[in-house]
């Protein structure tokens, strides 16, 4: 598709999120985020999932679609499999995008997915976030975007490639997703790995898109205010196991890191000048394996044992892995 045709027919996007309780500081920053989406141009369709206090009221105030019922795990955390499936069924956009409900977006986000969608029909767009302390409600009157962007560039901190807060993807990309709990680690890394395994173009939009993450603690979870407590929970351990669904032995043997892709694993970069191949993914792949010599040795041993197995043994091994 040519550049001219992409401006003549701009693809729409369905943004979806699952907010937490609209209480205290979390309530303030979620309202900031969602209101920023409502003023974005081109205008997205917005779907809010879940029945947390305040969600239905925010949806009604801004005229957004609200879906209260979402499948959850035994700890009451929404499952991304159901969120993504419902978003595609209910949304009208040719592009679908999950966004964490504390992320402020600007017009450059919408402009970026238009460019990527014109370039590829099978893609995932991600990008690094900029952390910023925001304690008060944002005033969206006047030139709020210019002022907030200036504050983010001046005072904010660009986060590492492991922090992934939005996923803009072509409709139908994620046809099958395991029962991963949202916000409980590993689920976001798996989404990148899955896109790469499907042969989709994974585009890092960091160089063209500024997204602002409003800093907060983790007191809204049942695990306490620190990430370390949550990572040690049964819920996060289950997420790690589920990322290995195609080969459960990978978790038992400690290889679930093979599915922990980050933004550095993107195949391409979106820049003001265009979309270019990203050589960083090669370095990331090398680093992923070279930093785990023991794991590499185990994988090599496993590969050799499979290649040397007799046909009958291979069949038994295959049945065992199912």
Which role does the model predict for each range below?
Residues 31-44:
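Short, acidic, metal-binding catalytic loop of nucleotide-sugar glycosyltransferases
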Residues 44-51, 125-126:
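Short, hydrophobic beta-strand segments that form beta-sheet elements in well-ordered domains
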Residues 12-14, 19, 180-322:
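C-terminal catalytic/acceptor-binding lobe
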Residues 20-22, 52-55, 73, 102-104, ...:
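Short, solvent-exposed loop/turn segments at secondary-structure junctions
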Residues 88, 104-193:
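Conserved catalytic core of nucleotide-sugar-dependent glycosyltransferases
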Residues 48-99, 106-107:
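Active-site-proximal specificity loops/subdomain of glycosyltransferases
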Residues 42, 61-63, 198:
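Short, structured coil segments at secondary-structure junctions
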